[in-house]
């Protein structure tokens, strides 16, 4: 059953409600950049695009390095002979991770489905299915436009022998990122695509399936292709993909009783972020990070060329961590694997320790094409460490730090910050000079409030981990953390963005407001409010999409819910129709499929509406949401190995425990009354909505 209106068409659920997770349209956007993307942790493309990308496969030296374009065999468009005018619909089903194109006429229905297999990450596939309507018998032919050319500007492609009916090409990237650096070889097998498929007169229905396997070894490509063929023969290729997506959604969902566009935005954001993470149950998955435009984007000159920024660690990571800590760990492992490059970056700039690149690709060396960002936008190093800190407090996974390289990274970052600080005799505190803050309108400034606060947090975390592991804490870490300057105007009671900032000066994006969240820098609520009031009117209206999400979190913290709602509503000008693809700037400029903006928006709900805050000892909650939302449900919150479901209304809160391996279990503690509720697996608790926290219950006998 479906409803139509304004060129869009929505799926209607059994209860008569439109399904917020299914986006359908009778036409495609005129700008092809706004087409839906289908990706998994290894492969990605935009539908109807002639290229695909492989995670971690870049071509080009230093600032020229970009995702290597690989010709896409899944770039196929279904058409019908002239004279036939079927009803046409295009659908992105975020529940199943599948894009489909449907042609319906009085005599037949033809459907084209395309997907990147979520659990068999080396596979992309598409199918064509034709159903005959009752009372018809003539042959039905659907034409397939497949403009595939086995060429690439980034790979030295050669043809190999066919394998199990598949064509085979392989080739190495042309230019390494650094001299002597890796030049991966890509191997691709694909089912040849005919010019047309025909449902013969004696057939009622038929499906044709087409497979593409991509890997960095011939052996893996062939193994994956054979596995795909076996699933096809068993009729389970697509169903195994949709089962993987169903399991993902069971362990992670955000829904609410409120406006449909808000619900759709949440499903869209989660779909595009979940598409990027390793499949569940694959520890050790060799992950290559998440770029602002995702794996589908990042060809030369597009979407920051597929490089990884703070967007991953600050904007995307917290959402992944809250639901899937194993996937969050894979993101951190990418930073650990590129630590060697970060050590060299610091050394080249004359500092100790590790300086993470503003733009990172395969090696951790700086690949930003403009020197100033790599030299001055150094808050990235603290942003990386904050992700490690959030992970540590959420999971208590000591193995990552003790044996898997985490501690080496933490201590190297602490060394970097100490070496980057200089003592000011005049002010009797440490300065960090000559930086570019998150607000990129300003550079070569001293004592960026955000940069210095994130450096302080890095040092405090490093000292805390050292104490946990009984490692002597260098006195320098403690001193630098204690005495680093975070600019504060005691008269106006607000944080100037940097030394010499004049109130009213324009700001590109959220900067000082990030002190409150995610940094949780200690401050009085009056100061938090003043920072919001000071910077909101001077922040660029059409700036990056995550900006207003962070202002919204601030106002929600202060319980000014309607003010928060007004700011969150601004985000909708960055969401495009019909597939909910985000653009970086509201005027349509900048990166497309902007996962960073989606991450910020999700945080506004996941950490703003709920009041979730990850601290050293607990997971705090303090709900507040605007009047047009009557109920919020967050399924699959992960904390210390447990899985929780929060159902929140303005009057009542319910926490259900779906998994709790801990003994003693977790408990919920209310802030004001001190009331405690043990959280046992399979049970739920409820209480009047109030602030509180989830923490480990004290051991019996203590």
Curated annotation (Swiss-Prot):
The active site is at 440 (proton donor). It catalyses: (5R)-5-O-[alpha-D-glucosyl-(1->2)-beta-D-galactosyl]-5-hydroxy-L-lysyl-[collagen] + H2O = (5R)-5-O-(beta-D-galactosyl)-5-hydroxy-L-lysyl-[collagen] + D-glucose. Its EC number is 3.2.1.107. GO terms for cellular component: cytosol. Pfam families: Glyco_hydro_65m. Substrate binds at residues 310-311, 508-509. GO terms for biological process: carbohydrate metabolic process. One of its GO terms (molecular function) is protein-glucosylgalactosylhydroxylysine glucosidase activity. InterPro entries: 6-hairpin_glycosidase_sf, 6hp_glycosidase-like_sf, Glyco_hydro_65_M. Keywords: Glycosidase, Hydrolase. Catalyzes the hydrolysis of glucose from the disaccharide unit linked to hydroxylysine residues of collagen and collagen-like proteins. PANTHER family: GLYCOSYL HYDROLASE-RELATED (PTHR11051), PROTEIN-GLUCOSYLGALACTOSYLHYDROXYLYSINE GLUCOSIDASE (PTHR11051:SF8). Belongs to the glycosyl hydrolase 65 family. This is Protein-glucosylgalactosylhydroxylysine glucosidase.
